[in-house]
Amino acid sequence: MPVLVLLRHGQSQWNLENRFTGWVDVDLTAEGEAQARKGGELIKAAGINLDEAFTSVQTRAIRTGNLALDAAGQSFVPVTKDWRLNERHYGGLTGLNKAETAQKHGEEQVTIWRRSYDIPPPPLAPGGEYDFGKDRRYAGKDLPDTESLKTTLTRVLPYWETAIAPKLKAGETILVAAHGNSLRAIVKHLFDVPDDKIVHVEIPTGNPLVIDLDADLKPTGARYLDAARAQPLPAVG
């Protein structure tokens, strides 16, 4: 039966600095690299043989996937990159320190932007420091200027349905190395998590989440490979 392994990228430099990262291409810290390797070691220890991997076009996710595959002894596994697996676009909050933003706009407003399901932050102004339309990896793409978790899911799911789900339905074991919110979108879809509950689902960095699926891609079981760093999971069935 198909198996899906979700792996959130290891700690990035802006995670460490408590900044809204979103689509900014920030690299892993040394700790983040270690988390990615540990994730791969856990995959190897669990005896999971991957058939294919998917990741975003952001360096922190790409490197997490590569480091994990190498540590798992499976660096030969083909990897497909697509921008639709990117992190949520934080719009006008991009690059800002989270604590300073709360002081400026109020804790309640920032919490709404971060944790509501369908309320996005203010849009990113065009032509500024973080104008992703200038980045050639997004050439010809219709890009958002901000996203809520709801619109992140709207972006992720078509790619899931056309690229990843068919591989799983063929019985493959798939790794998706991506980001907290793009992975949260997949979890919401698979487990049918209510809108008001998904914003509270946390996915820890560098800890492989293994989801066993039936032929219809309904979860039959789910577990984190590092139990000591696990977070609560949605109910199966």
From Swiss-Prot:
The record marks H179 as: Transition state stabilizer. Catalyzes the interconversion of 2-phosphoglycerate and 3-phosphoglycerate. SMART domains: PGAM. SUPFAM superfamilies: Phosphoglycerate mutase-like (SSF53254). The active site is at H9 (tele-phosphohistidine intermediate), E87 (proton donor/acceptor). It comes from the Bacteria. Gene3D superfamilies: Phosphoglycerate mutase-like. Belongs to the phosphoglycerate mutase family. BPG-dependent PGAM subfamily. The keyword Ribosomal protein does not apply. GO terms for molecular function: phosphoglycerate mutase activity. Homodimer. Pathway: Carbohydrate degradation; glycolysis; pyruvate from D-glyceraldehyde 3-phosphate: step 3/5. It comes from Caulobacter sp. (strain K31). Its EC number is 5.4.2.11. This is 2,3-bisphosphoglycerate-dependent phosphoglycerate mutase.
